[in-house]
Swiss-Prot record:
Official protein name in the record: tRNA-specific 2-thiouridylase MnmA
Region spans: Interaction with target base in tRNA: 94-96
Residues at the active site: C99, C195
Residues annotated as site: Interaction with tRNA: H124, Q341
GO molecular function: ATP binding; tRNA binding; tRNA-uridine 2-sulfurtransferase activity
GO biological processes: tRNA wobble position uridine thiolation
InterPro entries per the UniProt record, alphabetical: MnmA-like, MnmA-like_C, MnmA-like_central, MnmA-like_central_sf, Rossmann-like_a/b/a_fold
Pfam families referenced in this protein's UniProt entry, alphabetically: tRNA_Me_trans, tRNA_Me_trans_C, tRNA_Me_trans_M
Family of this protein: Belongs to the MnmA/TRMU family.
EC number, UniProt record: 2.8.1.13
Ranges for region Interaction with tRNA: 145-147, 308-309
Keywords, in A-Z order: ATP-binding, Cytoplasm, Disulfide bond, Nucleotide-binding, RNA-binding, Transferase, tRNA processing, tRNA-binding
Gene responsible for this protein: mnmA
Residues involved in ATP binding: G9, V10, S11, G12, G13, V14, D15, S16, M35, G123
Length: 380
């Protein structure tokens, strides 16, 4: 068996299958590696065994070696423990970003090198290119599937060793290729959500690790009690579903939206205005930012930003602060910018990097703050 030059992360899905097929067609010495990132909890919802069988079938059809690695312990320590801690603190984390940084482009890359591969490849909808001595992360050609948002924590070493073979494809073309070459996964449904939750109810899953803690749901305008909640950590800013608020006397029969939460007092705040003033913000402060190039383009610059996946680009001004965080000022007010989620910055199709959102200047968030405002500290 020859030593592979490229190790493809085969997930058992159609995207990684086509990625592997394209590399074989290009004459690369390829092998496939299936990662198990979540230990079987008996629910059967992750379909890991089915995915593994599909990955084996794809590798067999392509005539490439198949490898398996169990990274469930690394995933638990590097991703899931942080996931739980963030929810317990009332924030809304993004485990996919951490999974890419801590598992797929760390432990998978290490395993590939141990097996003799020089580079890794994945089925992400993104592109990587070299400009001079610098590696750039670009959005995928299919903007509706672009996954650069989840890859913004990668650095130069990782990009230099990574291929994204399907980054130039539209999803419809990828499906056609998979069907035309008879890949076993050509008709397989795309996976959605977080693997360790699968098709299960999110609240039920989270409740296994964070016990219910009922409290009041209040109107921030007058403090009136609207209903009760099972735990503030089950909800995120802007959420409509799952509140289970029935008819409220004196209120119109309209949907309610989460506009804030106070973990210390165990209170959830709601409003019937989808674009409620209580959760509109013009500025955010981040945690320490990560720059794909190794450093920011300038101490102060203009670019576009996304504060959630698939959000339209929002023009903004970025100020890099002395502690490594960034202050972002948007050209227009933003709805439901959520602490714990990822801020990702772009210059056209080039992903500059990003950071975890630490705070915003939304009126309700500022009112509930018990520590000095990070924006007042900057002004001082």
């Amino acid at each position: 068996m020859s030593t592979p030059r490229v190790m493809v992360g085969v997930s058992g899905g159609v995207d990684s299958s086509v990625a592997a097929w394209r590399l074989v067609q290009q004459g690369e010495a390829v092998a496939g590696l299936f990662m198990q990132n979540w230990a079987d909890d008996g629910s059967g919802d992750c379909r890991a065994e089915d995915d593994r069988r599909d990955a084996v079938a794809v590798c067999g059809l392509l005539g490439i070696p198949f490898h398996f690695r169990d990274f469930s312990s690394e995933y638990w320590q590097g991703v899931f423990e942080h996931f739980l801690a963030e929810y317990a603190a009332g924030r809304t984390p993004n485990p996919d970003v951490l999974c890419n940084r801590e598992v797929k482009f760390k432990h998978f890359l290490d395993a590939a090198r141990e097996l003799g591969a020089e580079r890794i490849a994945t089925g992400h909808y993104a592109r990587v290119t070299q400009r001079g001595h610098q590696w750039l992360l670009l959005r995928g050609a299919d903007r509706s599937k672009d996954q650069s948002y989840f890859l913004h924590q990668l650095g130069q070493e990782q990009l230099a060793a990574t291929l994204f073979p399907i980054g130039d494809l539209e999803k419809t073309d990828l499906r056609r290729i998979a069907r035309d070459v008879s890949l076993p996964t050509h008709a397989k449904k795309d996976s959605t959500g977080i693997c360790f939750i699968g098709e299960r109810d999110f609240r039920e899953f989270l409740g296994r690790y964070l016990p219910a803690k009922p409290g009041q749901i209040l109107d921030p305008a007058d403090g009136s009690v609207i209903a009760e909640h099972p735990g503030v950590f089950y909800f995120t800013l802007g959420q409509r579903e799952g509140l289970n608020i029935g008819g409220v006397r004196g209120r119109p029969a309209a949907p309610w939206y989460v506009v804030g939460k106070d973990v210390a007092s165990n209170v959830l705040y709601v409003d019937q205005d989808r674009d409620s003033k209580w959760m509109l913000s013009e500025r955010l402060r981040s945690e320490t930012a990560h720059w794909i190039a190794g450093s920011p383009p300038a101490r102060r610059f203009e670019c576009t930003a996304q504060t959630r996946y698939r959000q339209p680009d929002e023009p903004c001004t970025v100020q890099v602060l002395d502690d490594g965080s960034v202050l972002v000022t948007f050209a227009r007010p933003q709805r439901a910018v959520t602490p714990g989620q990822s801020l990702v910055l772009y210059d056209g199709d080039v992903c500059l990097g990003g950071a975890v959102i630490a705070a915003t200047d939304a009126p309700l968030e500022q009112r509930l703050r018990t520590t000095p405002s990070p924006f007042e500290v900057i002004a001082a």
